[in-house]
Amino acid sequence: MKKASFLSSLFVAAAFTVSAQESATITLHADKAEQIIPKEIYGQFAEHLGSCIYGGLWVGEDSSIPNINGYRTDVFNALKELKVPVLRWPGGCFADEYHWMDGIGPKENRPKMVNNNWGGTIEDNSFGTHEFLNLCEMLGCEPYISGNVGSGTVEELAKWVEYMTSDGDSPMARLRRQNGRDKAWKVKYLGVGNESWGCGGNMRAEYYSDLYRRYSTYCRDYDDNKLYKIASGATDYDWNWTKVLMENSKDLMQGISLHYYTVSGWVGSKGSATEFNHDDFYWTMGKCREIEDVIVKHCKIMDQYDPEKNVALLLDEWGTWWDVEPGTIPGHLYQQNTLRDAFVASLSLDIFHKYTDRLKMANIAQIVNVLQSMILTKDDKMVLTPTYHVFKMYGVHQEATYLPIDLDCKIMNLEGERNQMREELIDYPVLRTLPMVSATASKNAEGKIHISLSNIDLENELEVTINLGDVKATKAVGEILTSANIGDYNTFENPNLVKPAAFNEVKVKKGVLKVKLPAKSIVTLQLQ
């Protein structure tokens, strides 16, 4: 989680002009399919922050809230349906203050700590290594452990790896057995620090790259467990960080992380999650789409040092970041989640699919009750957010083959003081044009083709023509996510205001799909 200040919050009027075209044309290139969309692109992130863990994922075995061995039953079942592929933990900024030995053994003996990064909350360590890794086993997802480099020692991280993954007669394996777990867990992903340029230690790239080399050396592979080591990478426009790590440490890492938030700035108001105008919406869509330029630029730097693409890029924090909801603790980052957030999810996933030759994982922030979450909870109530519904609708693309497309659609020109000032602050050309349609397509192992479409035009239905080429189809069935207002969201009193519905505004004739795509809608189709 980011704790940096480099960009002013700018909520000033912007000028938007839109081309007159009220239709869009997509050409599908199924014959050029090569890349597999890794399921890890749909990864999640859980930090000890606010009520993400306590009250979100975990309530404890003695809670009156229905639970499975301490895990909230309603949340667990919803995540099981989502088919979470990978879960990152324990942070975020919390990771570099977390000492794993405080979170093992009898809960009554675990020491408490102050969560200094996030509101000064008292952390009782009742959710630790066993609780996290057991949850991953229950969900059927890969664990992604973020190790403490900022305030921890090499020995501490090395022993944690041994504790989790050694099946031998080693000291840490014996300690694990003493704490009730005989067989070692399978742990693939290991992050060596988090945001080391900021909350993880305020380090220079050169210093961190040397630390990475040292810490990663002692994170060993035990038995048949093979670690996938991930260096703490850059924040959005910090090209030098990626350059230095690739120059100095690429042969010792399997991946390098990247963080990018759709946020107006890090000083002052970030804007309301639920109260915004049309200009705010379109500016947000432009900021969201800038992630493509950021990914491309970091990939080009990596290509200079690693043309074989042996080192992956992992976008292990992304999503929207608004002001917290009124009446909530500022450091707990609890925000509502509207149809606007759903579009940030769909547009981002469309972009991610295009770059999976290098981009192998993405973890949205965060899974429950924090930032752009899948789920919100309050006492014994739970609600699924519009973002949850996008992830479920897009689940058909996991492990499918990406099908390239050409897209011709209406374009909005983004001008105004907001973008001009941002460009000066970040010393990088910001996005000046915004397509009104975003799309992606894939073919799964059974040969089924799925197409996802987003119409971000808030007022106009668009007729989308999809040329299928050699693909044979006689009909298409699908789901749509939309609502009466772009600011609509689900509440504990009205949990189903924004939810998917059946969609049949599709005609198929002679290799062409004609889709009537309503204003502010997201659709996923299956060709038949």
What residue spans do the PLM features occupy?
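Bacterial Sec-dependent N-terminal signal peptides
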Residues: M1-S23
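Alpha-helix capping and helix-coil boundary motifs
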Residues: L10, G128, N277-D279
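Non-catalytic accessory regions flanking glycosidase/transglycosidase catalytic cores in CAZymes
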Residues: A20-G255, I291-V324, T328-Q528
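Active-site His/acidic residue clusters
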Residues: Y261-Y282, T328
